[in-house]
Amino acid sequence: MRFRVSILAASLSFLLAASLGIAQSVKESKDTILKAADIPSTLYPERVFFRGKTAPTQHRNTAGVHFADGMYVLAGLVDSSGYATSIKAKYQGYLIAEVPLEIGGQHVNPGAYGFGFIQGGKFVLMDLGAHDLFQVDAHHDAAMPHPVPFQIIAGSSAGTYLLFSGRNSIEFKRAE
């Protein structure tokens, strides 16, 4: 009888420890930076709507962050050739966020946006009607040895990311 109780207690202890270990590993899972090859066309569309038109995306120039809770931030360059010069000057990319973000110190609600890096060293974020939501200072990395057209890399602190278009970048993070 004691032997059965001991085995039962040991089994329950093992199951409890295993379930706590699984819960701990779920908590410790990390955000994943996505490159273009990691983003299927079912996640990031081939064409996006902006200012009354649809424009093709450049899938080879997309990137994103897949957060540990399953939510995404995806961004990429677009072909803005059909747009007016004033819009083309600032509409270079498309951002899709499932979570609130902080970009360059500015709060951004979940949604879809146009963005670009413009003269004067600024990053501009626009709503789908091409209205500027804000402009913030961007960083230009003249020392970058081999710039690529578009990428997202880890920022200087945990949970921050740098969105690069060529040598220009802006820092973003998931907002609280």
Q: Which stretches of residues belong to each language-model region?
A:
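Bacterial N-terminal signal peptides
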Residues: 9-19
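Bacterial N-terminal signal peptides that target proteins for export
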Residues: 1-11
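Acidic, glycine-rich flexible loop segments
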Residues: 115-148
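Mid-length scaffold segments of soluble, non-membrane domains
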Residues: 79-128
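Exposed boundary/loop context
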Residues: 14-16, 63, 98
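Primarily secretory-pathway and cell-envelope proteins
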Residues: 22-84, 135-176
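Conserved short hydrophobic patches within well-ordered secondary structure
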Residues: 2, 112-115, 162-163
